[in-house]
Amino acid sequence: MSAGAPVAPRAASPQLALTRAPRRGLLVALLAALLATGSLVAAPAPASAAGIKVAIVVGPAGSLTSSYLRSARGYAAQARSYGATVAEVYTPNATWARVRAAVQGANLLIYLGHGNGFPNPYNATLTPLKVDGFGLNGSLSSGNVRTTYFGEYYVRTQVKLAPNAVVILNHLCYSTGSSEPGNPTPTPTVARQRVDNFTAGFLRTGAQAVFATLGEASYLIDSLFTSDQALLDIFWNAPDRTWAYRISFPSARTPGMTAVMDPKAPGTYHRSVVGNLSMTAATWRS
């Protein structure tokens, strides 16, 4: 064939044309069968957070205040991204009156600030008016340094959360069993008592579980809104879990509830949860 001579288009092979048609028909038939039997199912849509209330409280924490406020605003944005309603009460205007009003009926309560727990180096007996609750502003615009404590008594007598509510205590001394910076490492017995005591008031508000962590809490929020996991599984799926030094015990302060602690190392208490740990995130959302 000479260069430049026109080339006639090649006719499709009859065998190829006959082969393609049956294959196309087979694929269509297979797809129809899968749809009919339910074998081909679309991925589930994200759970709706309509009607879920999240309350976030930040108390005065001195030099740590700005960091806690930044974390709190991030948690608020995260909760709103799922469709939840968010109430925020932040220092220097986080008085007890404002906090008490904001947290009523919350499905999720998150508190960041100073923690005052028991046992501690200052008191021989538990003082419910001052320990195991919130550290807040004593008056409006009282600043970000001075802390007024509203303890377990105020929580259990004046707060009513939604049924099956969850509480997250974030960055609080004592709440995970830890001591204040510079104080001696607690014994395992003292650490367990601190965890059990700090959760007791909150578990009398309608809450089914109280998580405490000295690290980020965003994974807890995400799991509550997007998974169907049991609360214990959510706890153990934490990105900073250790597991090797885990402690589990029945709550003495709240009979029927279980406490689990996950020390980073012996004596280093940074995560805990107390509550009805078989409850699922789906139940929390319902």
Q: What are these regions, as identified by a protein language model?
A:
Residues 3-47:
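Secretory targeting and sorting signals
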Residues 3, 95, 141, 146, ...:
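Short, solvent-exposed coil/turn linker segments
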Residues 57-61, 89-93, 111-115, 170-174, ...:
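Active-site-proximal beta-strand/loop segments in catalytic clefts of secreted hydrolases
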Residues 50-139, 189, 193:
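A domain-level signal for caspase-like cysteine endopeptidase catalytic cores
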Residues 118-207:
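Cysteine protease catalytic core and zymogen-processing segment of caspase-like enzymes
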Residues 175-286:
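Active-site-proximal C-terminal subdomain of hydrolase catalytic domains
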Residues 79, 83, 106-113, 172, ...:
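Sec/Tat-exported extracytoplasmic proteins
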Residues 46-50, 158-160:
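Short boundary motifs at domain starts and secondary-structure transition points
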